Design a protein with these regions (language model features):
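Class I S-adenosyl-L-methionine
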Residues: 34, 38-39, 43, 48-169
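S-adenosyl-L-methionine
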Residues: 2-38
Length: 169
């Protein structure tokens, strides 16, 4: 959260103007507390054990349902619902991603969702995130972003929908 705050400050300093500088950035453990303010976006990076082999959803603290319950009435809604960005373990398998989607659906039925895998190469996925509601891309369920070694080059972005090609696997 501290890094996100610092990154937003850097973005604001590069010309995004006073509106970003006037924004409230709340850093904490995911529990809202007694506040009356509504928020435009929730960026959640739940704590996970560093040396875990399973990267199960039950290892996140606090859990996604706890956080969504705390925040659901504190988020502004646009025409596609609230703006939520979940940073998750890149090791989540398909069944765990489906479980995350089911949890999201219990709080915001039929909301748009875009899964984003990000890699810097060397055969590994560095980040996995779920962009929800206002942050999701309509008609794009999955996106892969390959960041090149030279930051002056544009990243490779591949987008598409889910299409099962086999029941096996």
């Amino acid at each position: 959260a501290m890094a996100a705050n610092s990154n937003l400050k850097r973005v604001a300093d590069q010309g995004f103007g006073q509106s970003l500088l006037d924004s409230t950035i709340r850093i904490g453990d995911g529990k809202v507390g007694d506040i009356q303010q509504k928020f435009a976006m929730l960026h959640l990076d739940p704590a996970r054990p560093r040396n875990s082999r399973t990267h199960g959803l039950d290892e996140m603290a606090p859990t996604l349902p706890e956080i969504f319950e705390a925040w659901k009435d504190k988020l502004n809604h646009g025409d596609r619902g609230p703006a939520i960005l979940l940073d998750l373990s890149p090791r989540l398998d398909n069944s765990q991603r489906i479980e995350v989607e089911e949890i999201v659906e219990t709080f915001w039925p039929n909301i748009g969702k875009t899964w984003v895998w990000t890699s810097r190469g060397k055969g590994r996925v560095d980040r996995l995130s779920l962009w929800i509601g206002q942050l999701s891309s309509p008609n794009v369920q999955r996106r892969f972003v390959r960041i090149p070694p030279d930051i002056k080059e544009k990243p490779l972005v591949i987008e598409g929908d889910i299409e099962e090609i086999s029941e096996h696997r």
